[in-house]
Amino acid sequence: MKITFEIEYRTRWGEELVLLLGKRRIALQYADNGIWSGTAECRRADDGASYRYAVECAGACIRTEWYPHRLRLGDLPPLRRLRIRDCWQELPADAPFRSAAFTRGIFARTAAPSRAGRPARGLHPQQGVLLRVVAPDIRPDERLGLASECIDNWQRALPFDDAAFPEWSCALSLPEGAAYKLVVVGRGEVRPLLWEEGENRRWSTPAGDGFLVDASLQPRFPERRWRSAGTAIPVFSLRSRESFGVGEFLDLKLLVDWAAATRQRVIQLLPVNDTTMSGTWEDSYPYNANSIYALHPQFLRLTAAGVAEDDEYRRLRDELNALGEVDYERVNRTKERLLRAAFARCGARTASRADYKAFVETNRHWLLPYAAYRCLRDEYGSADFAQWGPYARYERRKVEAYCMAHGREVGFHCWVQYHLHLQLSEMSRYAHSCGIVLKGDLPIGIGRTSADAWQSPRLFHLDSQAGAPPDAFSAVGQNWGFPTYDWERMARDHFAWWRSRLHKMSEYFDAYRIDHILGFFRIWEIPAGALHGLVGHFNPAMPYEAGELRRMGFDLSDGRYTTPPLDEQTLVAIFGDLADEVRRDCIRGGRLVASCSTQRGAAARYPGDGEHDRRMREGLLTLLDDVLFVEDPYRRGHYHPRIAGGSTHSYRRLPAWLQEAFARLHDDFFYRRHDLFWRDSALRKLPVLLTATDMLACGEDLGMIPDCVPETMRMLQILSLEIQRMPKTAGASFASTADYPYLCVCSTSTHDMTPLRAWWREERTVTERFYREVLHGEGPVPEECEPWLCRRIVEMHLASPAMFAILPLQDWLAMDEGLRAADPEKERINVPAIPRYYWRYRMHLTLEQLLEAEDFNTTLCDMIAVSGRN
């Protein structure tokens, strides 16, 4: 079949259009009136293939479409020639609705697709016209239609077929010049409910030979601000009668049932990747995965993987489920023991199945290195691959030989991943069947001793650490310990590592939270020897050159501004009565001795928990933070102002005029100097990632936000995160929920914050201000955040313009006296200020009990409905 592709596009001098169909590049010819066309020989086997138009100049591609087109031939009559008229697919205003969150989840067609608009096979092969229109925001109880003056004088609409939703099709032929409009009709109805804006369209019988597929129409419907609600909870926090001391993937079925029963549409999870490194509770941190692909074995339902449900199993399950929190070490030890016994019994039988072989083959590029990593970690007793002798450096052939030699152990880890894949895939399909979206979490970092760092070390700066500057979560900044990315190297293959990562994630999730989206603009990079985040710097950045700083009054040649002050006044201020000991044991020749010259060294020298070691350790860490400038590690002689340098002793020692100079250059550096630079940095990365899959992207944009971030997120239609307690307006104590943007996720708190009830207790002055200014309360401020207060706060979020109000389960339950936890302090998931925190929160009631709480569920359902969500 010969297919002629046509598109209207206004080029500039020297530009030309090409069609990219699979591996084919087809040069288009310019006709007139801005129309370009080209012909390609296609077969029925090409049905479903994607293609894009691109603009080239002097042989180089300078612009491509945001969305691909899809070649759909299955609903056409037998043809020798076909013409397809397209329109350029730029990022549209309805981009979020084109995501899998809506097309496979919220607006997915669960009923049999309508065939009303599919008489294409009955049209004459040389005269027919098939309209194809992309309209993703048509709800499941609605259909796209076409109304015309010549179809019952506008009173009846011809419905389109939604078999390829969000693309709609309708085969028809109207009289030349007939007026028509696209409309929305109720499912099973013909009378228009919603009309296109603007003037009537006029039917024009296309010139030329062959059947025409006209995909150039773009709907002009008025914006309808659809909104919904959801719940955020880590998988490990789920509790059911069948779970084994920790939440499991199959527990999501009950959570989906509850969400559907209460009119919610989204379930937001924390990362679910394997974090096994030390084998201790420290592996409970979900953002330090050992693989960006592998799922955590703790989430496996053992009985569904072949573990016998015998007396021992039931005893262990009941013991672990009786605990108020997750016992990470015992749960994972016990699960692995039972899984190994099941693998010995039925692993060989599973390995012979065709679907298992297909899973291994499809995922071979990461699965075998991951399995080898798990084996080597056990063999050498450490996840630090630098200690693995001949395997310290990843070599593909050597690792493949290792896998062959250790086939049974490698096979065990592949078998576990296979069952995890089956169970999470089952939950994803079940959520789709209920119109529920599973929203995943994309961590900004990777584990320093992960399989990813072992397999692809050149993609990372393994000699640095990622973190965050000081903010509301931590006064000394955050040090996550992750290596930072070598973005320049990643860009060489068009960010293939990221595209592969997101593709795997999209097998299970329809939406995702981009953890610390600022990291795609710039990352806070911390020296390897530091523990705090204060002496970090942004990367990429434009640090000041030494001569530039000299002209501002800062001569850095003698090191006075780049090394800690060791004068008597500073030492006494920091160490008090220990100042003499510091001077005697830690300083030689006017410098700190080697063992105290880095924060890691100081912590190692004074590791004890007693008061002396604690004071010495914390004092040295504070002293080492006390500098005004940090030298750039990539460009010697270039310097970054130390973040929040105005709080240092070094700053207080400056004369007033120099303090003013530092304040000016500090504020310019952190709030103005990099705005366009960081925007351009993000625009080189984010569009590639956003178009890698059809998942809905939501950014975590809290903290120190330069102006370029919200601007870029709006441009790319990435949903922002709005937290009432973390206002983005300078000088505001609390954000106004009524002023939230539409394209955002709003929430009462995050996993890094205290839930409502514990927050109410934290700072009485803050909660009193909130009670007076936000809730307009009168009289004494309640000592506790009582159910009626929690409901008021929740209602404010539900009433906001935000597309999604996704609240922690703890804050939903806080509205009900009978369901809320007895101790709100036990509901905290993470404390960012504590570097090694035990992530073990587990909901205090079972999901079965939650489903049986009819009064609460009815109340919640009514609240969501009254708020206009869903």
Segments predicted by a language model, with ranges:
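Aromatic-rich carbohydrate-binding modules that target alpha-glucans
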Residues: 2-48, 56-77, 128-179, 185-211, ...
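Short intrinsically disordered, low-complexity coil segments enriched in acidic
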Residues: 24-28, 51-56, 614-625
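Extended cationic-aromatic binding surfaces that line active-site or macromolecule-binding grooves
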Residues: 50, 56-57, 186, 266-275
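Short beta-strand motif preference
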Residues: 51, 180, 231-233
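C2-type phospholipid-binding modules
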Residues: 83-84
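Catalytic cores of glycan-processing enzymes that make or break glycosidic bonds
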Residues: 93-121, 126-130, 174, 199-870
